Amino acid sequence: KECMADETVCYIHNHNNCCGSCLCLNGPYARPWEMLVGNCKCGPKE
């Protein structure tokens, strides 16, 4: 499966395309409103 590289901004509609997890500025859990505004980035696999 194609996936986005680490440090790529992940939005709510594409967070499952990260190679690892989608991490937000306020912690490891991607909250919907943070993902809508582009505050989250792909991170390493857990």
Swiss-Prot record:
Keyword Disulfide bond tagged: yes
Disulfide bonds: C3-C19, C10-C22, C18-C42, C24-C40
Main location: secreted
InterPro entries found in the cross-reference section: Insecticidal_knottin-like_sf, Toxin_28
CC annotations in GO: extracellular region
Domain notes per entry: The presence of a 'disulfide through disulfide knot' structurally defines this protein as a knottin.
Protein name per its UniProtKB record: Mu-segestritoxin-Sf1b
